[in-house]
Each structure stands twice: as structure tokens, then as C-alpha cells.
Amino acid sequence: MGRTVVELFYDVISPYSWLAFEVLCRYRHIWNIDLRFRPAFLGGIMQQTGNKPPAMLPKRGEYILKDMKRMAKYYQVPVHTSADDFQRILGTSSLTAMRFITATDMTNPQYLEPLSREFWMRFWSQHEDISQPENILAAAQQAGLSAELSQKALEMISTPTVKDRLKETTAEALKYGAFGMPAVVAHYDGKPHLFFGSDRLELLGSIIGEKWLGPVPSPKL
């Protein structure tokens, strides 16, 4: 039986996307899956579906800050929360970063994983502004891209090709029924199965016939 294609639609402004990203990376050599990263734009999904940021409901915002801290510890992902996180999110557009990630995916896909991880590290661990070109270039070079490749990707973000690719990927997520991120789509038994949230990966395993071994599984020997 062939590997099950599992697509992860994500935006680096979403901390729960980071949790799903890291856990799926851990499982890709344990489960019989073909993991595909699909950088998309959360702002576009929120706008198209009429979804609202969690902080719009104060009590929910308070809960999420506590939940994120617990989840980060449980998933062993270095998300560092602070009281001003929602203000940082509302004051930061991830569009430039996601276009840069998309441009890199189109030209040098081998850097997609480390680059995405580096953006999460900078926004959620180091609390940097990932919308600024100098921080974007620094993230790219930390992820292994040369100065030349980084500059080329930065120049590409304003091109119709990159803009259209990001729009298309976001539209695909919406087509599958996404209303937020992370959106995980498993192509199993002849149809797509959508899972929303980093806490649905155990259910994903159940649907595709794989065993859940916790968020930090021991790799196969």
C-alpha cells in the first residue's frame, strides 16, 4: 500500500501550526505518510470565512495564552508566550513572510522546512518582527540560504507568480474546508479528510490506520 499523502497548510504567525509542523515532522518516518508542507496565508482564510482572532473574545484570549504554554511544554516546542502576544499578532502581517517562504518553496524547496521553522523561532521564541526585510533575510541565512538566494527570494515576493501561488494554496485550503490553521488534510480511502488544530493528530492517526505514540515518539530503529 502506498504512503498516505498528508498536507499541512500553515502560516508562521500561528503557534499551533508550529506544534503540528514539529509533531508531523517527527512522525513522517514512523507513519507511512508522504508529508507535504503547504505555506498559506491565515489572514486570507480568516477574511474569506468570517473567522475572528481568538483575542476578540477576552476570556478566550486569556485561556489560549495559558493553553499555549501548556501545549508548548507537552509538545516540546519552544513557544514562549507573553501577555502582549495578541497585540503582536494583530500588529504584524505575516503576508511578506509567507510570500518569502512561498518564493523559496518555488525555487529552493529543500529549504522550506528549516526556513519555516526559523520564522516560527524568531516570532514565537525570540519575539522578533518577521515583517521587516532585514529580519526576513537574517532568518533565511540562518536557515541555510546564501545571501544571494535570500536576496533573490526577497525580490520575488512582489511578483505575480509568487502572489498567485500563495493565493492558490490558500484557496486550496479553503476548498478543503479550512477556517483557520493549522489545517491538516489526509488523502485516504479515496477522499480528503480535514483536521483542524494541532490537537487532532491522534485522530488523524486513527483515521489513516497509524498508531499514535504521543507528541514526541521514539524514532524507528
Enumerate the language-model features and the residues they cover.
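C-terminal cap of thioredoxin/glutaredoxin-like
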Residues: 4, 13-16, 20-33, 114, ...
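Beta1/beta-strand and adjacent pyrophosphate-binding region of the FAD-binding site
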Residues: 7
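Structural alpha/beta surface segment adjacent to cysteine/selenocysteine redox centers
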Residues: 12, 18-126, 215
